[in-house]
């Protein structure tokens, strides 16, 4: 049942290295260090130089520092090249910028890591793609598997929103609902590795996923005129996106920015460790009940992933902060009504965290912060309905009732 281990020769000399013991090996279908069992990352020889051209080309303009061979055909749907938007109404000072990942092909940032990992999997000749997911990764894996001509299976928690599972099933992936939370789905998905399937779960398990995530940093750097923001605020479950963005800036040979791990208070293992000064993150033993389902990861069975994220936050001089359900709901409303951006609750957590940090003067006036908006609001229609409230509609009026129309418009006068 096990798959033969194959390797890829990359454009720039690259290798897998262990996050903990510094073991080094070739680019292959390996998910953990053969010496100590820790997670792996990809390292390249030399400092990355940005290519000529425009950011509109998407993530594959950076392929020289991605773990694929020079002549490989990318598995792509046009991911990346997402805008970094200046806010005016939400933050008149101009210090807040929004990295809008909702415009990726399947509506979330997960298209970046999945595109790279699917390309690697196809190059290695693996049998299919599997993931554990709260929805967004599953949708991306299903779509990119279809694009690659590979089978896909998505293991999801029982409470995953129907809007997300409908998208997964629509593109032909098998959906396995697990009674339990994300950690339970994660444990089951790992079993597929022994069948020669690539595990594209969005934790630290697949080192090639982070390579797609890091392109967010490359784009921010270019879109800001090759300048570094003071802060980058990222909604966090296990935290690979945050770590990957930090890695991307490091590969550019620049210092900063300070990284902020934003979590929902109902599931905040990284924040808890940060606030108590702990060196290691513990599994979240409380109930996990939050509208921000896309980042509700209690890390049960793999708390070391949270520890890795915590280490990056501290290394960058950043912070970790939790926000309440009401703060998240308000941020969802503000983004929609002030900036025209529909985001899911998991993404709104980052915006709520920024507002909280600004109010506490952690983020100072004059500093620039990029908030990463990770997923589209259409991923979770129920959350949108809750945020909109009943006051948005006037009720049914008679055709031709100009007075009723005028009454509806009076709210803007």
Predicted regions and their residues:
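PLP-dependent amino-acid enzyme catalytic core
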Residues: 2-413
């Amino acid at each position: 049942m096990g798959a033969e281990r194959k390797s890829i020769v990359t454009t720039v000399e690259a290798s897998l290295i262990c996050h903990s013991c510094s073991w080094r090996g070739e680019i292959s279908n390996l998910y953990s260090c053969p010496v100590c069992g820790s997670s792996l990352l990809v390292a390249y020889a030399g400092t990355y130089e940005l290519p000529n051209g425009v950011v509109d080309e998407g993530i594959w303009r950076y392929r020289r520092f991605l773990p694929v061979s020079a002549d490989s055909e990318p598995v792509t749907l046009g991911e990346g090249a997402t805008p970094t938007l200046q806010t005016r109404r939400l933050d008149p000072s101009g210090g807040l910028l929004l990295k809008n990942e909702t415009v990726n092909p399947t509506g979330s940032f997960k298209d970046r890591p999945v595109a790279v990992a699917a390309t690697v999997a196809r190059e290695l000749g693996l049998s299919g793609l599997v993931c554990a997911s709260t929805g967004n990764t599953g949708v991306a894996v299903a779509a990119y598997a279809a694009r690659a001509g590979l089978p896909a299976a998505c293991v999801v928690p029982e409470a995953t929103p129907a809007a997300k599972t409908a998208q997964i099933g629509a593109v032909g992936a098998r959906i396995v609902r697990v009674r339990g939370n994300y950690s339970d789905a994660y444990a089951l998905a790992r079993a597929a590795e022994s069948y020669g399937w690539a595990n594209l779960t969005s934790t630290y398990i697949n080192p090639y996923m982070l390579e797609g995530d890091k392109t967010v940093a490359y784009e921010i750097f270019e879109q800001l005129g090759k300048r570094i923001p003071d802060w980058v605020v990222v909604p966090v479950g296990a935290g690979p996106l945050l770590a990957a963005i930090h890695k991307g800036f490091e590969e550019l040979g620049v210092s900063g920015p300070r990284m902020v791990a934003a979590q929902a208070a109902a599931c905040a293992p990284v924040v808890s460790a940060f606030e108590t000064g702990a060196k290691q993150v513990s599994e979240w033993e409380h109930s996990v009940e939050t509208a921000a389902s896309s980042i509700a990861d209690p890390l049960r069975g793999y708390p070391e992933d949270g520890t890795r994220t915590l280490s990056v936050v501290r290394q960058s001089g950043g912070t970790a902060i939790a926000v309440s359900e009401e703060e998240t709901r308000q941020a969802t409303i503000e983004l929609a009504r002030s900036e025209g951006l529909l985001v899911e609750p998991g993404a709104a957590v980052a915006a709520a965290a920024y507002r909280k940090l600004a109010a506490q003067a952690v983020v100072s006036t004059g500093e620039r912060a990029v908030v990463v908006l990770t997923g589209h609001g259409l991923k979770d229609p129920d959350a949108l309905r809750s945020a909109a409230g009943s006051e948005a509609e006037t009720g049914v009026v008679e055709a031709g009732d100009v007075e009723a129309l005028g009454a509806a418009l009076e709210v803007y006068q």
